[in-house]
Each structure stands twice: as C-alpha cells, then as structure tokens.
Amino acid sequence: WFVNVDVASYYPSLMLVYKWLSRNVHDPSKYAEIYHTRLKLKAEKNPMQQPYKIVLNSTYGAMKDKHNAMYDPRQANNVCVGGQLLLLDLIERLEDHCEIIQSNTDGILVKLRRYEDFEMLDDLCWEWEQRTGMRLEFDEFQKVYQKDVNNYIIVPSGPLRDEKGKPRWKCKGAYVKKLSDLDYDLPIVNRAIVNYFLHGISPETTIMECSNLRDFQKVVKVSSKYKYALYSPVVTEAKIRDEKGRSKKITRFSGGEVQTDKTFRVFASKDQSKGGIFKVSGKIVKGREKNPEKFGNTPDHCFFINDDVTNLPIPDELDKQYYIDVAWDRLKDFGVER
C-alpha cells in the first residue's frame, strides 16, 4: 500500500503560522481571510475555491519578484527553506516505519510494509501537525510506477475515476502527462504507456487500434538559431585523418530538400528511401559548415503533412511499429521489460 502525505496549502500556511508573509503587506489579516475562505469552499467542493488558491499561491512568487510591491526575498527564503526543513523532520519521523518513495515541495509518498501500519503512520503525522501547526492530507494508492521523481504515474485503489468522471490517478512527466493542443506531440505513445499501467493493455494493442492520424504526429519548429529545415538528405560516414595524422570518423550530408516552412507535423514512414528531417544553422566551424542537426525524437524515415490532418485517414505509409518501439523504450525507463 502506498500513501501520499500532502501538506494542505503548504506555503500559505507557513506564511500565516510563522508570520513569513511579505513585510510589505499592511494588513496580513486579509490574507488569512482569503486562506480560510478558500479552505471552506474547498471542503464544500465549490469550484470558486480555485481563484482563492491562485491568489494564495502566487504570493510566494511575488515575494521573489523585485518589480513587485510584495518583494521580500528574506521572507520568501524563510518559506522555502523552513518548509523543506519541516518536511525533512517529518521524513525522519517516518523513515523507520515505512519506505520513503519520493518527496517533493509539499508532500511525501511512502510505502507501508503492512496496511495495519497506517494507524501508526497517522499517529506520527498527527504529532508532527501538533508541533508545526500544519495540516496533512492523505491519499491511498495501490501501485506506483516511477522513472524518477519528476516522471511517474500513481494508480489508486478502487475506481480510476470519481463520480464526476475526473481521473483519480496522478501522473507527472512528459511520458505520461495529458497533452494539450499546444504540446500535442506523440500522444499515441503517452496513451499507450498510460493504458499499459492503468489497464494492462499492451502498447501494440493501443497503437494498432488507433485510427486518428493526428495522434501519431511529432511537431517540430525551426527556431531563430537556424536558417531552414532540410528533408531527406543523404547521410554517409567517412574516415579521415586530422592535422596530426590521427584517424577519425566524420558524418557528411549531401542533397536533400530545403524547406521554406518553419513548422512541421512529422510522421514515421515505412518507406526506407525517405530520410529524416534536420535543421541547418549554416555556422562555420573550423573552416567548414556545421553539419545539419536532426530534430529531437523524430524518426530516421519520415514524411510530413503541414495541412490539417483532423479527418485524414491513416495512410499505408505510416510506420506504426516505430511508435510501438518508442513506447516500449519509454516503458523500459520505468523498469518494464518488453
């Protein structure tokens, strides 16, 4: 059993309990009023708690901004360092009785050796609450899959969604996060990984059954550091000798199609005669032009469609095996063997 122990409204609580609010605030009681109003609305599950949360949490950032009237770096450092020290104190109380999986700014994820140990955990946390003036919240989880502290998916016990259909699992990191329209890159791979962890569905099943072309896209952009994109150049390896007579291997590029567009919707291709897509800076290094650089996380063989692909059918050329391999490579980072 896993338990996520979070400090409720941590930074605002520290500012109030330890008087670490910016010294430029003339009436701290107003901040306390916002704090308690938000807690009341949250307990009622009232969505109006959200704007109060934004006001409370943005205060810390304002104290670090020298252009803000609330600028007070000493108090901001008190909040940050003091908060971490209090959390470290809690970790030291718990570590002999459970396994610490990870910690972050305002919480700790622990693994209980036995479910019966929860009462002991609760007692230790209660004692910490009495000493510090903070309040802890608990969430129980059944499984944790973790690549590192910033990339994980935590699966709850019981239903995966609440009564409103909102996901009860927690995830963080590029491999498993839900993508928005602004960062809709390789969504089919993310979905394959999440389906594997939540439902035990193989990446092959998720990817092969997908019929939405947009879900396979990787969007890349030519930044201002580069002149243009180059599609499908011939790439060869050659051995030469440097000025000291030592043998070394170099990569040479020839041909390819210069692209005038700056943004590309890239897809993996089964056609081995098609190459990858590269960005060209045109910089001169040691008397010769710097080699083109391959766009990150793009296939060696690809095609691109820069028009709207919303209703386009999946072309036979799309290499779904490429996406399956990417999904398994990322699962391996979580410790899953193919």
Provide a role label for each language-model segment.
Residues W1-D96, I100-I101, K111:
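Helical catalytic core of nucleic-acid polymerases
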Residues Q49, L88, K111, E116-R338:
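C-terminal, non-catalytic extensions of nucleic-acid polymerases
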Residues D106-V110:
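Short cationic amphipathic helices and targeting signals
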